[in-house]
Amino acid sequence: MNDSNLNQGEVISVRGSVIDARFIKRLPKIHNLLKAGGAMIEVLIHLGAETVRGVALTPTQGLARGSPVIDTGRPIMVPVGEKLLGRVFNVFGSPIDNQGKVEAKEFRSIYKEPIALSQQTNISEIFETGIKAIDVLAPMERGGKAGLLGGAGVGKTVLIMELIQNMAGKYEGISIFCGIGERCREGEELYREIKEVGALEKTIMVFAQMNEQPGARFRVGHAALTMAEYFRDEVRQDVLMLIDNVFRFVQAGSEVSGLMGQLPSRVGYQPTLATELAELEERICSTGSGAITSVQAVYVPADDFTDPAVVHAFGHLSSSIVLSRKMASQGLYPSIDPLQSRSKMLSPLVVGDRHYRIAQMIRKTLMEYEELKDIIAMLGLEELSQEDQKIVNRARRLERFLTQPFSTTEHFTGLEGKMVKLEDALDGCERILKDEFSEYPEKSLYMIGKIDEAMK
């Protein structure tokens, strides 16, 4: 950019990560990047004929009123292409893994309109994960969005890490992991584990962690999606998109909204919550050229499923996998709640009559057990009828069979990680429902893979 085209202004206000700047020559466009010293600022609002308000994407230390600001004339542009595989990036598409520069041939804006409905496809095909509780009770959709919903410490990140490992071995497409506002330590651990299992060469990682500016956390999801869309549209490959955590995306938007001076709505969230979430979620879809399958962790604050952030996220999901604190406290891992978890794929037309019938029988058995728990607590198991005792025995064995040792947690538990085919998981559940394992102790079914392991 030569000096005659240089659009320079000056900072007139600094409030945390919100910057106001005046441009006499030409007003920068919405979403344009501004550069002020070492700080990068994104334009969000035009305040007047000469003034813009933007949010900083990098630390603002050293900025002061009167500091010069340069309009770069473009939005955030990230590299796309196969050269990105095996690398770790920030919101600007700059590598942060100390592996040198990325020789990308193409850069794209992180902003793009969602694909038109007429161009979207609905595949209605199961996406097998190798995790019994998910595949049997809340199967994921290829090209759909699955949410892992739960409070703090119930195992969302561990489940996402296990999904990456399971899918890396048999999955033919590209995996893109997007870390939004999560712990740096977890990101670093995940990078090492993906490298160890040999899946890094088919994975791209994009991070804006807890310590970064809310503006960066708010935009990193769009940056990762831009990379995913390239593989779907240009390379015509399926993409697995993992997002940890959608709640942190909403939280970053709330921080930005407050600093921008917008009046909050319910529970202090930004009034534009639904729109902002939809801008991200509606870009995740399948077309004739490829599918983007998304698995998203959604933190549930104080285990409150009526929280507006969680309610709005629910609306975009085709499969909701709810993690239960109660099950986690009993040591039933993965702590997937079989009664609250739901999937639109669990229909006889998609999964077949046998799978649907087994899943409904599991739910019915576990629901009846739940109703009997109060009687057991007051009077004891012996006071139940013979039929009710059978229901309790089946339910307790099903609960234990649906637990599973993970490769991710091998070094904590000492148990070898197991990946179970859907057919084996259905076979095991069906045999338990037929009382084939009523004589076996409950613990023989705990933390195993296939049902035959209980006989050893």
Predicted feature locations:
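Conserved catalytic network of the ASCE P-loop NTPase/AAA+ motor domain
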Residues: P139-E141, N166-Y171, K195-L200, Y230-V235, ...
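Phosphate-binding/switch loop-helix module in NTP-utilizing enzymes
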Residues: L137, R217-G253
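Conserved nucleotide-binding/hydrolysis micro-motifs of P-loop NTPases
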Residues: A49, P59-Q61, P75-I76, G93-I96, ...
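P-loop NTPase nucleotide-binding/switch module
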Residues: S67-V69, K83, I96-G144, V158-L163, ...
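Conserved catalytic/coupling modules of large nucleotide/cofactor-utilizing molecular machines
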Residues: Y230, R248, G258-K456
